[in-house]
Amino acid sequence: MDIVQQVGLLVVLIIELVIVIVIWVKVYKLCKEDRRQKKIDRLIARIRERAEDSGNESDGDTEELQDLITEGDNLMHIGIRDNRNN
């Protein structure tokens, strides 16, 4: 192999590496959002269940849900968007 082929091969490998990194970052963000949404769904279900059982909502669960929603709003302000709305 001459030097031109080696440089070309190196450029191709670097481009592939960048593509792989971009894909994995996107997958990580989607998984993180999915886990957050599942946690919110569980909290909502627990609040509803407790409201049906006792006639009122649990303040702790409601506060935790509010914290998660606020965290989601903060993430949207820094550029991470909810893909389900797109």
Curated annotation (Swiss-Prot):
This is Protein Vpu. GO terms for cellular component: host cell membrane; membrane. Keywords: AIDS, Apoptosis, Host membrane, Host-virus interaction, Inhibition of host innate immune response by virus, Inhibition of host tetherin by virus, Ion channel, Ion transport, Membrane, Phosphoprotein, Transmembrane, Transmembrane helix, Transport, Viral immunoevasion. The modification Phosphoserine is found at residues 54, 58. InterPro entries: Vpu, Vpu_cyt_dom_sf. Its main location: host cell. Homopentamer. Interacts with host CD4 and BRTC; these interactions induce proteasomal degradation of CD4. Interacts with host BST2; this interaction leads to the degradation of host BST2. Interacts with host FBXW11. Interacts with host AP1M1; this interaction plays a role in the mistrafficking and subsequent degradation of host BST2. Interacts with host RANBP2; this interaction allows Vpu to down-regulate host BLM sumoylation. Forms pentamers or hexamers. Interacts with host CD4 and BRTC; these interactions induce proteasomal degradation of CD4. It is found in: Host membrane. It comes from Simian immunodeficiency virus (isolate MB66). GO terms for molecular function: CD4 receptor binding; monoatomic cation channel activity. HAMAP family: HIV_VPU. One of its GO terms (biological process) is viral release from host cell. Enhances virion budding by targeting host CD4 and Tetherin/BST2 to proteasome degradation. Degradation of CD4 prevents any unwanted premature interactions between viral Env and its host receptor CD4 in the endoplasmic reticulum. Degradation of antiretroviral protein Tetherin/BST2 is important for virion budding, as BST2 tethers new viral particles to the host cell membrane. Mechanistically, Vpu bridges either CD4 or BST2 to BTRC, a substrate recognition subunit of the Skp1/Cullin/F-box protein E3 ubiquitin ligase, induces their ubiquitination and subsequent proteasomal degradation. The chain crosses the membrane at residues 9-29. Pfam families: Vpu (PF00558). Ion channel activity is inhibited by hexamethylene amiloride in vitro. It comes from the Viruses. Residues 30-86 are cytoplasmic. Residues 1-8 are extracellular. Disulfide bonds: none annotated. Phosphorylated by host CK2. This phosphorylation is necessary for interaction with human BTRC and degradation of CD4. Belongs to the HIV-1 VPU protein family. It is a single-pass type I membrane protein. HIV-1 lineages are divided in three main groups, M (for Major), O (for Outlier), and N (for New, or Non-M, Non-O). The vast majority of strains found worldwide belong to the group M. Group O seems to be endemic to and largely confined to Cameroon and neighboring countries in West Central Africa, where these viruses represent a small minority of HIV-1 strains. The group N is represented by a limited number of isolates from Cameroonian persons. The group M is further subdivided in 9 clades or subtypes (A to D, F to H, J and K).
